Amino acid sequence: MDEIQIASILKSSELFPIPQGVKLSYGTAGFRGDAKLLESTVYRVGILSALRSLKLGSATVGLMITASHNKVSDNGIKVSDPSGFMLSQEWEPFADQIANASSPEELVSLIRKFMEKEEIAIGENNKGAEVWLGRDTRPSGESLLRAGEIGVGSILGSVAIDIGILTTPQLHWMVRAKNKGLKATENDYFENLSTSFRCLIDLIPSSGNDKLEISKLLVDGANGVGGQKIEKLRGSLSNLDVEIRNTGRDGGVLNEGVGADFVQKEKVLPVGFGFKDVGMRCASLDGDADRLVYFYIPSDSSEKVELLDGDKILSLFALFIKEQLNALEDDEERKQSRLGVVQTAYANGASTDYLKHLGLDVVFAKTGVKHLHEKAAEFDIGIYFEANGHGTILFSESFLSWLVSKQKDLTAKGQGGSEEHKAVSRLMAVSNLINQAVGDALSGVLLVEVILQHLGWSIEKWNELYKDLPSRQIKVEVPDRTAVVTTSEETEALRPMGIQDAINSEIKKYSRGRAFIRPSGTEDVVRVYAEASTQEDADSLANSVAQLVKSFLGSS
């Protein structure tokens, strides 16, 4: 790193002094916190993103300014790798180091050492970095984006491009498309969604001459960017009657009593929904539209809702994909293709039982989207979801190539109208509709809606796939959370010695009992999850396991 480059970083970093007493950590959600404290962090992540682009041959990297389902006064920053997925975990320690560097001189020193280790060069013979920056609708987003731009620009030869107000999944999709050499504007994103949705609608089997009556879908936009974007998309969608509430244009506050996180956790109606909506099909997006849950109001005598969470969405997707695969001829390549679903230990046991009953390969991953994504990528078709509504479907390049050849082969044989050809076409359309970079509430809504139309199901019928087992979660404060070590799937405790045997003894006392413990990633607590055939038993099992944690670790 030459003197001109060092001077550039020293000069720009003086604009963004680091706040005192704040320690930040880059997690699954990137950096998050009070927006007033984040300018220096976003500036420094701008530097990191430019270095990441240079490391990967000047591929386009994305920066998203959002705090997802957090309150409106918060904000955050996360990086999209050129693949459209999250920042490589190998770079997360460097993100932590530079975000917490106490002075411009320490920042330069850390950057210099990292560039030497990663063999990153800046100079005339190297093409500059390219970083695309997007933000959600938070008032703090504009000034934070400018800090990110200055950070990118402090690495000589780098270009920062502001691509506007977007959902998080839009930014990831656009970065992925750009690096694959495809059209990558927001309009291209919408065109891709509407075209693949229409294709799937056209492939819905007709039952005689009867047309399926399509009821209206009510969407809770969380007063965020997702509601505004689905408004924009609605005009190009036939076969979908959508009413959007909580768009943020009518004075509602982002994520306050609205949104997927609120509905999933509280299991009550979001603001703007009431007894007039009894029996209606409702969907709720989160603040940056990367999570999706469905719900309906079963009667006008309660504010409680029937929730269809990420587990139910995963089950619907898996059922549909399995149906299409079953329609394909069992040639050698089809037999070898693997469909798998990935869940976390927090997935309701009833959903896991249902998926296994379908004959699917069910695997568990550590909590956190990045861990599920990696596991899902091991399959030809991998479907992953967390109960909170974050998830997607991944198709391997080799399986997509096989689908293309299969479609051509069937057409050449004059079997273009066969059920097998339709199944191949549906799978290809799903691979285009679904956002294979990250979970995307907009593409998720469209896929749920087209599958329900395909099956001729109401939301109540969908909800009957299985009945959730009652569950309970408890946090236990402990002196040292690191004393608990679990398996990689977090389903069993390896340490302290003997605690898992004690947990197993408690589980055996309850019908359909299941329980596990895991240390929190951010605070000195151990999280307890328990489920059983009745709520009373789930509560009792959770309390018993919490007592075991206290007796093995002590309580703080």
Curated annotation (Swiss-Prot):
Functionally, this protein is described as follows: Interconverts GlcNAc-6-P and GlcNAc-1-P.
- Active site annotated at which positions? 68
Q: Does the keyword Membrane apply?
A: no
Q: Which residues are reported to carry the modification Phosphoserine?
A: 68
- Molecular function terms from GO: metal ion binding; phosphoacetylglucosamine mutase activity
The record's GO CC annotations read: mitochondrion; plasmodesma
Q: What is this protein called?
A: Phosphoacetylglucosamine mutase
Its GO biological process terms?
A: carbohydrate metabolic process; DNA repair; UDP-N-acetylglucosamine biosynthetic process
Alphabetically sorted, this entry's keywords are: DNA damage, DNA repair, Isomerase, Magnesium, Metal-binding, Phosphoprotein
Q: RNA-binding as a keyword?
A: no
What Enzyme Commission number(s) appear in the record? 5.4.2.3
Tell me the protein family, please. Belongs to the phosphohexose mutase family.
